[in-house]
Regions:
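Beta1-alpha1 glycine-rich phosphate/pyrophosphate-binding loop at the start
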Residues: 1-75, 165-203, 258
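Internal hydrophobic alpha-helix adjacent to the cofactor/substrate pocket in enzyme cavities
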Residues: 8, 173-176, 319-347
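A Rossmann-like FAD-binding core segment of flavoenzymes
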Residues: 20-22, 72-83, 173-286, 292, ...
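FAD-binding core/adjacent interface of flavoenzyme oxidoreductases
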Residues: 74-154, 243-247, 258
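FAD-site-proximal beta/loop scaffold in flavoenzymes
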Residues: 122-148, 251-323
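Rossmann-like NAD(P)H-binding beta-loop-alpha module
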Residues: 136-187
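Active-site-proximal substrate-binding core of FAD-dependent oxidoreductases
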Residues: 146-148, 192, 309-314, 331-370
């Protein structure tokens, strides 16, 4: 996860790796995925770009551990974790191999939550991993090839959270550009954004919320707030509108359904014998240490740390995860040295920016609202902010600039 990898990077920068401690990062995948770029990867290269450009757009959103700069002395183990023995202080990976630890950082992240909806796992795609972006991209290409005025194709995105909004906005913008350039007929791709909440974009300030609605409508997206998915089949979605006993069933065409309506804590994290909150997240002390388990820390989507300014845990996001690593890494060093741990420093409010297709975005920073191109620039700068956490200066700048250059093709 974001938190685990960036914590390892902080320990390298602190000069303690191979001196004060040995650091091992365990992941089933061979690469770290930068999920805020996945929507770009999934919607990129739909305009006739070469196969090499398409491949680069998708791979740009990941970093192979074996070639990751700035992690000297860190050992990467590509194995699936099967369990954690908190008593024996061992991580069990595939093949029943045991990896002992003195300090453990649990950063297992989250996984899609299908809420028991029939047909959803089998008939919908999600956007969490690199291969998900590839599958969605290929599915869109197939629809573009088959769509016609007589047989339009329907794409339904279920879930108007940040990921769903950024994806649907970029997709709709791309479709409009293809129409303007007469690469496809106008109106042959129909895009719907559905969400169970009666109002969309509630994470934005009310004034920005209204502008975001107008922006998506201008891009041709049909907005369906208050729509709860009840079943997903091949070519359709059944849903309910309204609440309580007055639900009305509707059946919507969906040649492609993208599920972005919620995540849950990683299954392995929920299996740990530790205190959890009502959403299954690991309850932490204010030092990021797991309650009643000295030497075990957690961060990111699987962790529940109360923000003293709000009285509740912070949202599950990449931004929160890598921010937490500042104090987490320092407390790991303090723990190893036998020093008292310090409480986490958390902001009163989080900066938030959501891309809305092309060079347009919306968000807030320090209570100030931003819209349009200024917000889009700040959204791009937030990517650089993360890369500066993860990588040395020159590789961070090169990665960011290459991503900006490459994904700019999506915006014009």
């Amino acid at each position: 996860g974001f938190a685990g990898l960036v914590t390892a990077r902080h320990l390298v920068k602190a000069g303690v790796v191979e001196k004060l401690c040995d650091v091992t990062v365990i992941d089933a995948a061979a690469a770290h995925v930068y999920t805020p770029w996945l929507y770009e990867a999934a919607t990129g290269a739909l305009r006739g770009e070469t196969g090499a450009t398409k491949s680069k757009m998708i791979k740009m959103a990941s970093f192979t551990y074996a070639t990751l700069p700035g992690f000297k002395g860190v050992r990467f183990v590509q194995k699936r974790i099967e369990g954690v023995d908190l008593v024996a202080k061992q991580v069990v990976v595939e093949g029943k191999r045991l990896i002992p630890y003195d300090v453990l950082v649990v950063s297992l992240g989250a996984e899609p939550n299908y809420f028991g909806v029939p047909g959803l796992p089998e008939n919908a795609l999600v956007l969490k991993r690199l291969d998900d972006a590839q599958k969605i991209h290929d599915a869109i290409v197939r629809l573009l090839d088959k769509a016609s005025a007589r047989q339009p194709k329907y794409i339904l995105i279920a879930g108007a959270g940040p990921n769903g909004v950024e994806f649907v906005s970029e997709l709709a913008n791309t479709i409009r550009i293809l129409e303007r350039r007469e690469r496809i007929q106008s109106g042959i791709i129909k895009i719907t954004l559905a969400d169970p909440n009666p109002e969309l974009f509630t994470i934005l300030a009310p004034s920005l919320r209204k502008r975001a609605v107008r922006r998506l409508e201008k891009l041709g997206v049909e907005l369906r707030p208050g729509l709860r998915v009840a079943e997903v089949g091949q070519g359709y979605v059944k849903a309910f509108t309204g609440t309580g006993k007055h639900n009305d069933a509707v059946r919507l065409p969906a040649d492609l359904c993208i599920w972005s309506a919620g995540v849950k804590v990683n299954t392995l994290a929920t299996s740990l014998s530790v205190l959890k909150d009502d959403r299954g997240r690991i309850v932490l002390e204010n030092s990021y240490m797991v309650a009643s388990h000295p030497g075990v820390f957690a961060a990111g989507d699987c962790a529940s740390l109360i923000n003293p300014h709000t009285g509740k845990p912070d949202p599950q996001s990449a931004q929160v995860a890598h921010y937490q690593t500042h104090d987490l890494s320092k407390n790991i060093i303090r723990y190893i040295k036998g020093q008292p741990l310090k409480a986490a420093h958390l902001p009163k409010r989080w900066a938030f920016f959501s891309a809305l297709g092309g060079a347009c975005a919306a968000g807030t920073l320090g209570g100030v609202k931003f819209w349009g191109y200024p917000a889009f620039l700040l959204r791009r700068i937030s990517d650089l902010y993360y890369f500066l956490y993860l990588l040395p200066l020159v590789p961070a700048l090169k990665t960011w600039l290459e991503g900006v250059r490459l994904y700019h093709k999506n915006d014009c």
